[in-house]
UniProtKB/Swiss-Prot annotation:
It is found in: Cytoplasm. Ubiquitinated via 'Lys-48'-linked polyubiquitination by TRIM38, leading to its degradation. Residues 355-379 are annotated as: Disordered. GO terms for cellular component: cytoplasm. This is 5-azacytidine-induced protein 2. The gene is AZI2. The keyword Ligase does not apply. Residues 1-197 are annotated as: Homodimerization.
Length: 394
C-alpha cells in the first residue's frame, strides 16, 4: 500500500512538473474563453487533489487495518502455538517435579536404611567383640586348667594309662591272630569242600536239612512253652481275682460272723508265696477228706525251660503219662478245649507263676515269618491236660 501511495504522489508531482514545462500557447481566443478554461482547469485540479487526499486517507486507513489484522493473525498463531507448547511444557514440568519428589523420597529412605544398617552393624560388631573376648577368656581358662592338670597328674596315672593301652593293643593283636587263623581254616575248608565228591555234598545237604528240622522243633517247643505259660498266667489271674473277692467279702463280714481262725488262715495262705529260680509258687493247705487225708497234695513245680531239643515221642510219652496219672473223678480240675476258658475254684491247692522267656526262645519271634517243614504236632487237648497236670501233679 505504501508503494501505491508513493506512485500516486509521483503521478501528481509529474503532472505538476509537466504543467510547468508546458509552454503556454499564445491565446488565439479571446479573454473570456481563456479565463473560463483556466477556471475549469483549476477546479479540475482541485477536484483531483481532493480525490488524491481522500485516496491517501483511505490508503492509510487500509494500511492501519491491514497492520491490525496482521498483528491479530500473528497473535492468534502465537497463542495457538504457545498453548500447545505450554501444555507440553506443563506436563513435562509436572513429570519432572514428580520425578524429583520420588528421588527425594527414595534418597531419604536410602539414608534412613543406611543409618539403620550402620547402627545394626555397630551393635553386631560390639556383640561379636564381646563374644570373642568371652571365648578368649574361656580358652585361656581351659588352657590354664589343662596345664595345671598336666602338672598335677602323678606318674602313676600315666603308667596306668600306658598299661591299659598296652593291654588293649595286646587284646587287639590276639583278636587279629584269631581272625587270621579262622580265615586260614575257612580257606582250607573251602578248598576241601571244592575237592569233595557229590556224595559228601549230599551229606552236607542232609545235615542242613537236619539242622532246619531241629530248628523247627525248637521253634515248636518254644511255641508250646509260651502257650503253656500264657495258660498258666490266665489261671493265675483267675485265682488272684477269686482271692481278692474272698478277701473283700471276708473283710466286710469278718467282725460280725467270721471266727478268728479264718482270718489267720487267710493271712497264712497269702504269705506262702515263694520265689524259686525265677518261678513263683503259691501253696495252700489242701482240703481234708472225712478220713483226714489230703486229696491233692504237693505244689506244682515248673517244667524246665532250658531244654531246647525234644523228640516228638518223648513229648507225647510225657503228656500221655501225665494224662494217665490224672484222677477221673474230676474233683481237682476240669478239662477245657483252650487255655482261654480254663477256670479254678477256691479249693485248688497250688498255682504257678511261669518263668520269663529265656534268650534261647527269642528265635521263635524272629523266624516266625519263615516257612519251614514242621513235624507232626500233638493235639491241642494234650497241651491243656499237660497244663492242668503242671497245676495238679501228684
Amino acid at each position: 500500500m505504501d508503494a501505491l501511495v508513493e506512485d500516486d504522489i509521483c503521478i501528481l508531482n509529474h503532472e505538476k512538473a509537466h504543467k510547468r514545462d508546458t509552454v503556454t500557447p499564445v491565446s488565439i481566443y479571446s479573454g473570456d474563453e481563456s479565463v473560463a478554461s483556466h477556471f475549469a482547469l483549476v477546479t479540475a485540479y482541485e477536484d483531483i487533489k481532493k480525490r488524491l487526499k481522500d485516496s491517501e486517507k483511505e490508503n492509510s486507513l487500509l494500511k492501519k487495518r491491514i497492520r491490525f489484522l496482521e498483528e491479530k493473525l500473528i497473535a492468534r498463531f502465537d497463542e495457538e502455538t504457545s498453548s500447545v507448547g505450554r501444555e507440553q511444557v506443563n506436563k513435562a514440568y509436572h513429570a519432572y517435579r514428580e520425578v524429583c519428589i520420588d528421588r527425594d523420597n527414595l534418597k531419604s529412605k536410602l539414608d534412613k536404611m543406611n543409618k539403620d544398617n550402620s547402627e545394626s552393624l555397630k551393635v553386631l560388631n560390639e556383640q561379636l567383640q564381646s563374644k570373642e573376648v568371652e571365648l578368649l577368656q574361656l580358652r585361656t581358662e581351659v588352657e590354664t586348667q589343662q596345664v595345671m592338670r598336666n602338672l598335677n597328674t602323678p606318674s602313676s596315672n600315666w603308667e596306668v594309662e600306658k598299661l591299659s593301652c598296652d593291654l588293649k593293643i595286646h587284646g587287639l593283636e590276639q583278636e587279629l591272630e584269631l581272625m587270621r587263623k579262622e580265615c586260614s581254616d575257612l580257606k582250607i575248608e573251602l578248598r576241601k569242600a571244592k575237592q569233595t565228591d557229590p556224595y559228601q555234598e549230599d551229606n552236607l545237604k542232609s545235615r542242613d536239612l537236619q539242622k532246619l528240622s531241629i530248628s523247627s522243633d525248637n521253634m515248636q517247643h518254644a511255641y508250646w512253652e509260651l502257650k503253656r505259660e500264657m495258660s498258666n498266667l490266665h489261671l493265675v489271674t483267675q485265682v488272684q481275682a477269686e482271692l481278692l473277692r474272698k478277701l473283700k467279702t471276708s473283710t466286710a463280714i469278718k467282725k460280725a460272723c467270721a471266727p478268728v481262725g479264718c482270718s489267720e488262715d487267710l493271712g497264712r495262705d497269702s504269705t506262702k508265696l515263694h520265689l524259686m529260680n525265677f518261678t513263683a509258687t503259691y501253696t495252700r493247705h489242701p482240703p481234708l477228706s472225712p478220713n483226714g487225708k489230703a486229696l491233692c497234695h504237693a505244689a506244682s513245680s515248673p517244667l524246665p525251660g532250658d531244654i531246647k531239643v525234644l523228640s516228638e515221642k518223648a513229648v507225647l510219652q510225657s503228656w500221655t503219662d501225665n494224662e494217665r496219672s490224672i484222677p477221673n473223678d474230676g474233683t481237682c480240675f476240669q478239662e477245657h478245649s483252650s487255655y482261654g476258658r480254663n477256670s479254678l475254684s477256691l479249693e485248688d491247692n497250688s498255682w504257678v507263676f511261669p518263668s520269663p522267656p529265656k534268650s534261647s526262645e527269642t528265635a521263635f519271634g524272629e523266624t516266625k515269618s519263615k516257612t519251614l517243614p514242621l513235624p507232626n504236632l500233638p493235639p491241642l487237648h494234650y497241651l491243656d491236660q499237660h497244663n492242668q497236670n503242671c497245676l495238679y501233679k501228684n
